[in-house]
């Protein structure tokens, strides 16, 4: 009986690993836009939080301090969106898997 439980657990672990790998591949392709200042500044991040693009409205180019603040805010907005998307996708990758009590994934 114990052998059957171990085999089932190993199958679940393999399926979970495949699902997690697929979710990580999807995240690498993901692009998320964060914005600030009524979209005067926007930042596009990949699912791995690599900055792909920064857009700045020309009307604020003379205000360096505002630009700096808005870039930071837009980056943080995009970063929070990546975190939420990552949590959702990684959570759905383990959906239906019966994990032992207290078992937590590293994300």
Swiss-Prot record:
This protein's record includes keyword Cytoplasm: yes
UniProt keyword annotations, A-Z: Cytoplasm, DNA-binding
Cellular component aspect of the GO annotation: bacterial nucleoid; cytosol
UniProt xrefs under SUPFAM superfamilies: YbaB-like
GO molecular function: DNA binding
Task of the protein: Binds to DNA and alters its conformation. May be involved in regulation of gene expression, nucleoid organization and DNA protection.
Family of this protein: Belongs to the YbaB/EbfC family.
HAMAP family in UniProt: DNA_YbaB_EbfC (MF_00274)
Subunit architecture: Homodimer.
Protein's UniProt name: Nucleoid-associated protein Xfasm12_1216
Source organism of this protein record: Xylella fastidiosa (strain M12)
